[in-house]
């Protein structure tokens, strides 16, 4: 049975983490920004005081191509900045995943100082830490996982009600989703006596046969902390009460193909996903004269819309119209967001321009 073609249910949930992902160029950033304005405009019930209060929302871009600044016509950086016009409720930041991996990797893992890859550290543990950092840095998805683990620790202290991620294109996202499971399995083996001995022998061989690694028992707490961090990320990912993934696509072959691949991977790793946003639909009022180009595009799109409706009949499938211009600034994003809550109807709503006027 088809679900309501809106994202209204999300606004009344207790979700803490929302990921918006899909193929590049399908409108992920516009969708995530519009969704963020919706959450920031919707009060949340405070169980302690039994009253409603403004909801605090953090929007984070982990896409190296960062477009949040363009979407809001405002500059963002690696720390949360209030969004103009919604200063009390909506904050945004753009982070470079590689800086988390290479700049704060030891801290993310919970390594003690003497193996945190400090260049001034006198102990040979510093060299071992560098080896571990370089080895882990080659893992696909480690950049994105580092971001999430760091944010998971920091954001919980900043009193945000919900964090929305504007993610990198599908390939990066799939690696991120798979990594906690892979790392957790690896760490289980590594933390066994045999696994740790193997690591020690390998490290000794690399550093040199004469290097004294000292008391290797101090490594155990560090690796246990790493495993706990990874396991916490995995718990958050797979908790349907806390985490949801929204797939964004357009009605074209490659986008629909990648969406199905993404949905299958989400199911594989037990990550909740029951919402799909289909952008850039050519929809015109019935009173408008025929347009040869419009009819051709509608014919192509209707083919893939039929596939989407068939594949995701138990999803919230939100169908968004192609607009007359780019969606930039809070007013335009809020106008776009209206149709995440209310199904767009060309005869009733007419053409929508970026200023929010219907014609």
UniProtKB/Swiss-Prot annotation:
It is an enzyme of class 3 (hydrolase). One of its GO terms (molecular function) is metal ion binding. The active site is at residue 63. Zn(2+) binds at residues 291, 294. Keywords: ATP-binding, Cytoplasm, Endoplasmic reticulum, Hydrolase, Metal-binding, Nucleotide-binding, Transport, Zinc. Signal peptide: none annotated. InterPro entries: Anion-transp_ATPase-like_dom, ATPase_ArsA/GET3, ATPase_ArsA/GET3_euk, P-loop_NTPase. ATP binds at residues 23-30, 252, 279. It is found in: Cytoplasm; Endoplasmic reticulum. The keyword NADP does not apply. Pfam families: ArsA_ATPase. GO terms for biological process: tail-anchored membrane protein insertion into ER membrane. Its EC number is 3.6.-.-. Disulfide bonds: none annotated. GO terms for cellular component: GET complex. ATPase required for the post-translational delivery of tail-anchored (TA) proteins to the endoplasmic reticulum. Recognizes and selectively binds the transmembrane domain of TA proteins in the cytosol. This complex then targets to the endoplasmic reticulum by membrane-bound receptors, where the tail-anchored protein is released for insertion. This process is regulated by ATP binding and hydrolysis. ATP binding drives the homodimer towards the closed dimer state, facilitating recognition of newly synthesized TA membrane proteins. ATP hydrolysis is required for insertion. Belongs to the arsA ATPase family. Homodimer. This is ATPase ASNA1 homolog. It comes from Trypanosoma cruzi (strain CL Brener). The lineage of its organism: Eukaryota, Discoba, Euglenozoa, Kinetoplastea, Metakinetoplastina.
């Amino acid at each position: 049975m088809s679900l309501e073609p809106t994202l209204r249910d999300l606004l009344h949930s207790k979700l803490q983490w929302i990921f918006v992902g899909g193929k590049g160029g399908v409108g992920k950033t516009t969708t995530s920004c519009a969704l963020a304005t919706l959450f920031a405009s919707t009060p949340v019930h405070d169980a302690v005081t039994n009253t409603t209060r403004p909801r605090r929302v953090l929007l984070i871009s982990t896409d190296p191509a960062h477009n949040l600044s363009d979407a809001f016509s405002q500059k963002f950086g690696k720390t949360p900045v209030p969004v103009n016009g919604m200063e009390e409720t909506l904050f945004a930041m753009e982070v470079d995943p590689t800086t988390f991996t290479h700049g704060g990797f030891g801290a993310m893992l919970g390594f003690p100082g003497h193996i945190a890859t400090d260049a001034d550290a006198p102990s040979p543990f510093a060299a071992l830490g560098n080896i571990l950092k370089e080895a882990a840095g080659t893992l696909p998805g480690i950049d994105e996982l580092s971001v999430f683990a760091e944010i998971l620790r920091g954001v919980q202290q900043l009193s945000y009600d919900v964090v929305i991620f504007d993610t990198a294109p599908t390939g990066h996202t799939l690696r991120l989703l798979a990594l906690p499971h892979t790392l957790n399995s690896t760490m289980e083996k590594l933390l066994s006596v045999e696994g740790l001995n193997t690591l020690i022998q390998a490290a000794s061989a690399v550093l040199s046969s004469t290097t004294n690694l000292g008391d290797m028992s101090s490594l155990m707490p560090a690796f246990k902390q790493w495993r706990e961090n990874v396991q916490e990320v995995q718990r958050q990912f797979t908790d349907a009460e806390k985490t949801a993934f929204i797939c964004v696509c357009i009605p074209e072959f490659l986008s629909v193909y990648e969406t199905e691949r993404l949905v299958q991977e989400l199911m594989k790793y037990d990550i909740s996903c029951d919402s799909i946003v289909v952008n850039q639909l050519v929809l015109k009022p019935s009173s408008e004269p025929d347009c040869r180009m419009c009819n051709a595009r509608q014919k192509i799109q209707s083919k893939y819309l039929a596939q989407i409706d068939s594949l995701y009949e138990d999803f919230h499938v939100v169908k968004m119209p192609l607009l007359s211009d780019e969606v930039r600034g809070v007013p335009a994003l809020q106008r776009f967001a209206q149709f995440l809550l209310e199904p767009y109807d060309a005869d009733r709503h007419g053409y929508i321009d970026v200023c929010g006027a219907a014609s």
